[in-house]
Amino acid sequence: MSEGDLAVMKPETMKSYIWLQTADGSIQQVEQEVAMFCPMICQEVIQKGVGSSKNHAISLPQRVNPAMFSLILDYCRFHQLPGRSNKERKTYDERFIRMDTKRLCELTSAADSLQLKPLVDLTSRALARIIEGKNPEEIREIFHLPDDLTEEEKLEPLKNSMDDPRIRLLNRLYAKKRKELKERERLKNVEVEEHVDERSVDDLLSFINGRDHKAVKMSKGKKKKKKKKDQKIVSSNNIHDKESHDLRSKQQCVEEIGSSMREVPNLLSAEDDISTPNAGSEDEDIDDEIDPAMRELLDREVEDFAQRLNSNWVRSLGKERRPVHFSINGNGTTRRHTGMVSIWRPCMFTLF
């Protein structure tokens, strides 16, 4: 375009620009009529006279980042043009706010810092529809907000300047919950006081050194009890073993006596034969053949057996039996008085 063409161009056809600097330090050149749609920028240009050059760019608020500022400029370009119908504006606004919750919050904050009230109202209504019907926990989850309020702060009474009955009922509910919370805190403090350590300094020192004084005493007591219990068990086992040994010895003695007594009928039947002269001569012949030392040994054994038989028979069997009395003749034979039974031959058979 030549200089002559620029000279004949009307002033209204030439666009003027304003220099704006965003939060990240980048500088943009924006049409004046679009930038002036934001009240904050308009005040800076009129009151301070800045923005006419790159060296005197208008610094935008910290909350206005390049991405949000680009969206705001698109909104201003559409709405600052005359001749738009309300239906067109409404359709554009509905499409414009279709974004995620995080970006919608950032856009609301940036529009508020630029004092662009129509855009603030639009984004605020969109956020209101998102949180409608949600409880506090769900709202904190949607906006990723930390729960930094204590239970008491959550239950603080609400201001009711208009005397709303719903707020009155809500404050009553909060008062009841605060009372329950205080009661739980009181019970918790009581439990903590009950668990206070009341041990002496010596016990604490013992615990710090690695051994608890009470635990040591308890362990010693347990060891003593265990030792006594083991001694009782050992003594009872010894008594039981002794009784078993005595019982076995008695049973063995009874068996010996019984085996001896089974020979008594045979001895009784042979009593008459033994008392005859011929039998006596036979015994005398046998006695003559036995060595005198052996005969004396046999006589002592027979006498010991007779004494043991008379003393243990009745006690071991537990029955009353008629004792059998034996005597030893001068020739080494044994005979029974009062029913004289000679047991010389059985004794000889048993010993040999």
From Swiss-Prot:
It is found in: Nucleus. Residues 239-249 have a biased composition (Basic and acidic residues). Residues 216-230 have a biased composition (Basic residues). Residues 214-251, 267-288 are annotated as: Disordered. GO terms for biological process: auxin-activated signaling pathway; jasmonic acid mediated signaling pathway; protein ubiquitination; response to auxin; response to jasmonic acid; ubiquitin-dependent protein catabolic process. Residues 108-167 are annotated as: Interaction with the F-box domain of F-box proteins. The keyword Transport does not apply. Pathway: Protein modification; protein ubiquitination. SUPFAM superfamilies: POZ domain, Skp1 dimerisation domain-like. Its main location: nucleus. Expressed in young seedlings, roots, leaves, floral stems, inflorescences, and siliques. Gene3D superfamilies: Potassium Channel Kv1.1, Chain A (3.30.710.10). GO terms for cellular component: nucleus; SCF ubiquitin ligase complex. The keyword Zinc-finger does not apply. InterPro entries: SKP1, SKP1-like, SKP1-like_dim_sf, SKP1/BTB/POZ_sf, Skp1_comp_dimer. Keywords: Nucleus, Ubl conjugation pathway. Involved in ubiquitination and subsequent proteasomal degradation of target proteins. Together with CUL1, RBX1 and a F-box protein, it forms a SCF E3 ubiquitin ligase complex. The functional specificity of this complex depends on the type of F-box protein. In the SCF complex, it serves as an adapter that links the F-box protein to CUL1. Part of a SCF (SKP1-cullin-F-box) protein ligase complex. Belongs to the SKP1 family. This is SKP1-like protein 20.
